[in-house]
Each structure stands twice: as C-alpha cells, then as structure tokens.
Amino acid sequence: MSLLDVLANQHAAMMPEEYKHRSVDEMEQRVVDIKRAFGSKLFIPGHHYQKDEVIQFADATGDSLQLAQIAADNKEAEYIVFCGVHFMAETADMLSKKNQKVLLPDMRAGCSMADMANMKQTDRAWEQLTDLFGETILPLTYVNSTADIKAFVGKHGGATVTSSNAKKMLEWALTQKERILFLPDQHLGRNTAFDLGISLEEMAVWDQIEERLITDQPLSRIKMILWKGHCSVHEKFTVRNIEETRKRDRDIQILVHPECTHEVVTASDLAGSTKFIIDTIKEAPAGSKWAIGTEMNLVKRIINQHPDKQIESLNPDMCPCLTMNRIDLPHLLWSLESIEKGDPVGFIQVNEDTTKDALLALNKMLIIK
C-alpha cells in the first residue's frame, strides 16, 4: 500500500499545534526523559538522511534495510519509533516480532520514488510485458518500494535489492530468467546493469503512465526493463554540476549515489551506496577534496565529521529530502509522548498476506551470497 493510499483510507492524526510552540530545550529534555523511562522497551532507528535534531536521539543509524534488520534483531523493544519514511517503517514492521509496535512520527513522511509504482500500475505492466516476452521475466525491486510491490516481486519469484548489493542480486537474477523488470528506480537499475556489461541498447524503459515500453531495439535484444521511477533528490545532480566543480578545482573528486542519472554516474570518479560514501570519506586522507552527490543532511553531517577534509555538495543549491524532513523534533516528541500516554499515534502495520509474500523477496536477498 502506498503512502497516498494510507492517507486516503485512514485519518492520519495531525500533530497538535502546541508542539510547534514548545522550546527546543524543553523538547530535547522530554525526549531524554522518555527514553530513560522506557529504557530498552523503546528503540529509535534513524535514517542517514534525518536532521541532526532527530539523529541525536537515534539508538542506531543506517540505511533503510540496515535499520529494519537492526530493529528486527532487537528482542527487547516493545516500541520501534522509526525516524525515516513510510516504506522503511513498513519493512521494519514486516521483519519485527508480532508483539512489537512500529510507529512513524509523521504519517506524511513518504517517498515519491516508492509511490511511483503502485499495484494497479504494476499488475497492468506485468500483464502487458508477459504478453510481449512470455515467461522470461523476473522482477527485482529496490528496497525503496512499498510493501505491496515487495509482495508482488516475492510472489513472482523475485527479490529485493539494496544499492549496496544490487550488482550481486542482478547477477543472480540473470541466472534465473532472460530478462529483468527492475522497480521502481530506473537509474539504479540502469547503472547496475551497465556495470555488469549490459549495454544501454539492451535496456528498455516501462512508462507506467502511458503503459508502453520505450525502446528502439528489437524486443529480442532487451535484457533489462526499467520502471520509469526516480529519486527526486538524486535526479537533481547534473553533469553540468560536475563540469563546473572540476573547472573550479581540478583536484576535487566526485562521489555520487547510484540513484543519480547514468550520465552523472559515468562522469563521476566514484559511485556507491550511502554506506560506501560514508566509508570512502572516512578512509580518505586528510586534505583530500570531495564533492558529494547525495542528500544534503547527510552531506552536511559528513562535512562536520571530517573537518580535516575539504567536502562540499556537488550541487550547492540542493535541498534535503523534503518528505524525510517531515520527521523533526516536535513530531518525534509527539510520537514518544503518545506512547507514554498509552495511545500511540502513527502505528504502521502491514497485513499478514502482504507480509508473507514480501518476506519471500526480502529473505531471498538475505540468503543470496
């Protein structure tokens, strides 16, 4: 179920106005007090893209799958307050124990890319693509997708992928079927396939709005069918950003996330997952120069953590992920105080049938080495 469906089908509680008028010091102290009172019964995972005002209270930081797995490994927590976006909280719920409750501090914290693939579109695409290609297609989905899409992929024998293991998972998938349908991020799919030696001519794009396959090649040549989705943040980095940065400083290295366009990834010095970006900067020598193409909150945090290196955003006009930024200190406190009062808000629960099929896709990824 997409975030839009959630908000359409249930009344999403809105944070009371009073939280907007409380002082930062008061709110921070209340969060500290509640965390201390609940102890190990409360667990707060925080995604790398969260604001510092939220991350400072995270019990663990990481990417979406890392955090879901960490939360699932936590046997003591009764409440998991997931500081991320909707699909991440869904994954945490599916991997957690039945007695654990997963909460999202703001139900409006969605992901535009995840919502670019809904079930109606995906069912329709599968029907038309199997008419064209028969039983030669295996679906893969980026973990940045809704529980429904993960369930669809699991039901059809596919698996989930992360930006860290996408290459390994695509290699596996191509041993299973001749062609891959990659959802919902066309750029990660294209960059990964190209890295494996699949030419751009062997890739087609499925336009879910116009319901058509975009290619000028014979269908027999197509190995990758890329869903026409993208990350609204990473698509804003351009080759012009790279050219201007290098013109200003020839010694600077360009490091980007593979959710960027193929042209940007190809023009960069290095591309990799969020963990890869963090580790690369951590291991880089003092005095080295870097322009990073990823979400601004993370870039700012990396800059603050490494004052011995010259680090900047590849696009100085880049804004943070707007939906991720819906989770802020007031919403976090509101969520925690609702638990304290015994009436939790922002409860995330994926139904059993969807969970069963989605776990097929998730677990397949986890066991493939």
From Swiss-Prot:
UniProt GO MF annotations: 4 iron, 4 sulfur cluster binding; metal ion binding; quinolinate synthetase A activity
GO terms, biological process: 'de novo' NAD biosynthetic process from L-aspartate
Binding residue positions for [4Fe-4S] cluster: 111, 231, 321
Gene Ontology CC terms: cytosol
Residues reported in the UniProt entry to bind iminosuccinate: 47, 64, 142-144, 163, 257-259, 274
Cofactor (UniProt): [4Fe-4S] cluster
Catalytic activity: iminosuccinate + dihydroxyacetone phosphate = quinolinate + phosphate + 2 H2O + H(+)
Function: Catalyzes the condensation of iminoaspartate with dihydroxyacetone phosphate to form quinolinate.
Name of this chain's protein: Quinolinate synthase
Protein source organism: Bacillus pumilus (strain SAFR-032)
